[in-house]
Amino acid sequence: MSHSISMHDDDLEKLGESLNEIIMSSKAESVLQAARKKKQEFFDHYIKTKKTLTELLNDLVHTEEVVGQKLLDLDQQKSQMMQEIMKMEQEVQRSQSKSQNLDSELEFLQKELERLRDAEQEIQTLQQEVDEDTTEVIPSAIYVAQLYSKVTKIKLEFDTEPHILKGVHYGADVVTPINIDTSTRTPCEVSDELWSLVKTEW
């Protein structure tokens, strides 16, 4: 019995040695080192990937901020452009209104110019008629007045008020002043008073 146990212990020892030899001969250590290396490479790759992802996320956040700011700037520019467009439309409306007012004023001035031209033509026509009358009538009136003055011996003043008739009658013996308010008398009464100064004796 003891001999069997001793043999069993020897077998176990031999088996352990054999296993150690197998482990050493099967390059388990190199496999373990390779596994550790693989693990380290995987860890390094994980760290690198995580860093890359972090950078990508940071870039994405930065890009979103830049794009968001650009959108805000574009909205602000759009708002400013809309305000400018509204101002330009208002200016166009004011210009159109001014243009319409100017057109109305121009039309009014053209009508006034035509009216003034017509009035000028009428004045020229009247002036021509007056010139003709002056040429023909005034000398005749002067002649009649001179003849009247010689016959009646009455010399009238012409720088008096319109309703006052002033002058002098030169009689043979006496000079009689004349001062008649024609607004209080009829033309016949004035004529009779003047002729009363004239002697009918020849």
UniProtKB/Swiss-Prot annotation:
Describe its partners and assembly state: Component of the NDC80 complex, which is composed of ndc80, cdca1, spbc24 and spbc25.
Q: A cellular component term (GO) from this record? A: Ndc80 complex
Q: Predominant location of this chain?
A: nucleus
State the name under which the record lists this protein: Kinetochore protein Spc24
Note one Pfam family from the annotation: Spc24
Provide the species name: Danio rerio
**This protein's encoding gene:** spc24
Q: Which Gene3D superfamilies match?
A: Ncd80 complex, Spc24 subunit (3.30.160.570)
Q: Which GO terms describe its biological process?
A: cell division; chromosome segregation
The record's annotation in PANTHER family points to: KINETOCHORE PROTEIN SPC24 (PTHR22142:SF2), PTHR22142
Provide the protein's localization: Nucleus; Chromosome, Centromere, Kinetochore
Is Nucleus there in the keyword field? yes
